[in-house]
Amino acid sequence: MSAHTGASYEGIAGKYAATVDSKPWNAYYERPAMLALFPSLVNAKVLDVGCGSGWYAEYLLSHGATVTAIDLNGEFVALTQARVGQRATVLQADLTNPLDFAAGGEYDAVICPLVMHYLRDWQPAFREFQRVLKPNGVLVFSTHHPFADWQDYNTENYFAVDLVEDEWDVGKVRFYRRPLTVISRDLDATGFCIERLLEPQPTEDFRLVHPEGYERLTKSPGFLVVRARKK
């Protein structure tokens, strides 16, 4: 079985990037929760993992951070580079391999928005995040909520790690679902302590643009957002 499903974005990255800045699940649900868990960004050195089309990289820069942004998909790397120019270092990198561009203890924070569910095994990536973080550094990441995936994809065993496929407006995407206990276990095993865990609520702006989605997310979780600190 493949270690990651990031190749799912090949051929659809441009279509995805065209809508992701304003898509309510991102703009009015996932991002507000991520931002609420960010540490102070002024003069912070931050690694943006899975930079996509560059929204987070641009936000981090505008709030005083020095940014390295990485993505597996070459088209996303080009889109982020075009968006931020020379203000950030933008690289193509695979989370199933060591992050050889980064020195140990280089970053104050690692952010990883809606990326981890494309990996079958989280521990190698978490170990690299732990390595590149400074002592007491912070990891903030978002992922699919375990209950939502178990409910939506009719998998028989909640406690299993399963490969599932979804049909988006821009095409088919594959990812892995897993139970909450595996998420907690993998963080602890790689030297992280969970500080905060959010099951986000959609903002009022979400309700205005997508009432049906808003109604669902106020009653059933979609994403999980975690802030963990290097032990």
Where are these regions (language model features)?
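Class I SAM-dependent methyltransferase SAM/SAH-binding core
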Residues: L47-V49, S53-P98
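Conserved class I S-adenosyl-L-methionine
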Residues: M1-V42, W55, Y59, F76-L79, V138-D166, ...
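Short alpha-helix
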Residues: R174-L198
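A short glycine-rich, Lys/Arg-flanked "PGG" loop and its adjoining helix->strand segment in the class I
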Residues: Q123-V138
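A short SAM/SAH-binding and catalytic strip from SAM-dependent methyltransferases
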Residues: A109-Q123
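A short acidic, Gly/Pro-enriched loop at the edge of an enzyme's catalytic core
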Residues: D100-V110
